Amino acid sequence: MSGIALQGFRCHACRNAAFRSFAAISSLSSSTRRPQSSISYPGSKLYQRNVRTTGRRQFSALGSVQSQADSDLPTKTETKEDTSAESSHIPWYLQDESHKPSSHPLKQQELPPLPENPPPILENLLQYISVDAGLDDLALLDLRGLDPPPALGANLIMIIGTARSVKHLNVSGDRLCRWLRSNYQLRPVADGLLGRNDLKIKLRRRARKAKVTGDASSLNSRDDGITTGWICVNVGDVENGPLKTKNSRNRNFIGFGGTEDKVRIVVQMLVEETRSELQLEALWGSLLNPEAGEMNPAPRDDVWGDLSSETTSSGKGVDSIASTFSQRFPGRRHIHTQARPNTPEPLSHETLGDIVQESRPALPSKIVSTSMASPNVSSLLEQLSRLPEEEARRELGLGPGDRDSTLFLRLFYEAVSKSDTETVLIDKLSFARAAVLLKHPAYRKADLYRAFKSMAASGCSISEELAMDTVRTLLSFQGPENAANERVPEQDIDLALRVLEHMSLRGINIFNGEVFFLLHKASAFQSHVPANDAPGAMNTSVNPDSVSKVQVEELDRITTVHNRLSKLMASANVDFDYKDYPELLKMYFEHGNYSNFWRLWHRIPLMQIPRTKELYLLMFRLHAKLGHQRQAVDCLSSWVPMMAREQPPVALDEELTRAIMACMLVADPAIDQKTDDGTVSQFTRLWKQCLRDLESFKAANSQ
């Protein structure tokens, strides 16, 4: 199934569809939940359970609510306030939970309603899948009106169902194919199906191999390499209903295949875990009805709501990702559409140069000014970047509506008024980026996205550099460096995904290592936060009261997002930049994702990249900081001898020796005492060698 799906990456439309599926299932902007049967998309052709009863109930109540809306609004408001005030005094152990309705088990077996002009086979097929095959939570998607047609074919109807187990999945898929062959003389194709006794034979072979090799951990692996928990049964082309569809008129067809009157039916059979991970209903529902994404009020309110100058309540600044990007890659070059002057254009006597004294040393720039901006605006942003942060924030005024309260604002809007429309939009986008990077409380990331949206709506040419600068700013952290429990808000990630989607529609390749690195970092914590119930996961030398902890479920959710991003990178054949490897290794290890840490560690030499001293130093320090004895023992036993086998070999110096000794103190806390007493242990020989190396380093430094 994966091999067929990956062929679509060669088409630009399929790349856009793949990005939409990533945005739907990556859990970056919303928590991953299993699709419930009561969800419906207004105006779309997504048919699910409970749509009939829920829609009638909501529609019948609409008239009575509208007739009494004006008269009952004050009373309802007062009643709501009184109720909330009274409920605030009720302790949690006295709160009544009987009002929470529980879904009836029989609702899982309800059949979805048939679409308009259904094929004759569809009703019997749904009945067989639900009753005989035993699949639950059936959902039916009518994709016949989708233009361009999906990769599975035109005039497509998709059925999605949940199996109870992997064994039930394979048995149901096999019986469905046999039923279609015997009753309808069709030739279905089932991708991912293991035939009769194939699953049992493969499991026996894997257990026998694990017993011979002594690797019992592979039996408990969730990804056994045998089944994916997903079977796609392509029923084939069947006869359509007696009525013609509304879109049956002749039109130019673009794509593969032909425009026939037959309908193709595909049955997606998944286990519960795979269905909640893939979110096929959310993907195809967003394609059928793009307006359904507008129904989510949480991220949209910050973008489409009131962005007046008086609103100063949402945003803080950003931290290190976008602000230090030019420092991490100082030699990076770009292609510009207009020449940039070698020296800043001289300002009038009343300029910011009077504020920045020549005698003061140059401060590190916290603003990456966009090279596409006009020369006057670029020079103003450069002058602003030389100011201290507090002074620069004062120069930005009171908010987006302020234009003349400070000297910088007067000069900026004066320069903007003399430019053409495209240059004005670029200058305003650069100004919004600078304001967000300076952590001004009145300038929010929603203002930055609004400037980008205005530029995109005007039809201006948006370069890849300008769009990526916007994405870096949106995916950057807001609080101070090393802030506890600091994460990028979901609304900001949603805005960045919209910018990336716009880039994809303009033909810009968004499947690159930098985008995935930013998404990895934005979905994680800014600094190391240990788990709340992980005993021994933290070094005993650190005061546990001074460290903020999080629940294990939070770290597991971050690990799930990182694993999905890694799978998408492997599917698109994308890899990270080598310069980002140390930060990725640290992020994986500190969030408890040790499998991805070692996978990336083992992948480095396979890419013909040597593991340097910095990587080994990082690994030993991370294990020493973790404080886990067993992991420290495995690290020392495996990788201290490996340092001499690297190409080129990693030589010991004083810094690396001290890191190894700190890791040995975690593996054996009494190793120094054992060395003095002459007791032989696993690492006493290595400890003595490290002591001799430290003495030689001190002697060499003294000379």
Curated annotation (Swiss-Prot):
Q: Which residues cross the membrane?
A: none
Q: Does the keyword Ribonucleoprotein apply?
A: no
Q: Give residue spans, biased composition: Polar residues.
A: 60-72
Q: Where is this region: Disordered?
A: 60-88
Q: Name one GO biological process term.
A: mitochondrial gene expression
Q: Which domain of life is it from?
A: Eukaryota
Q: Where is the composition biased (Basic and acidic residues)?
A: 73-83
| Membrane topology qualifier | Peripheral membrane protein
Q: Might you report a single GO cellular component term?
A: mitochondrial inner membrane
Gene3D superfamilies for the chain: Beta Polymerase, domain 2
Family matches, as InterPro entries? Atp25, NT_sf
Q: What is the annotated localization of this protein?
A: Mitochondrion inner membrane
Entry annotated with the keyword Disulfide bond: no
Q: Where is the transit peptide?
A: 1-42
The UniProt keyword set, sorted, is:
Membrane, Mitochondrion, Mitochondrion inner membrane, Transit peptide
Q: PANTHER family attached here? A: ATPASE SYNTHESIS PROTEIN 25, MITOCHONDRIAL
What function does this protein fulfil?
Probable mitochondrial mRNA stabilization factor.
Family classification: Belongs to the ATP25 family.
Any idea what this protein is called?
ATPase synthesis protein 25, mitochondrial
* UniProt organism field: Trichophyton verrucosum (strain HKI 0517)
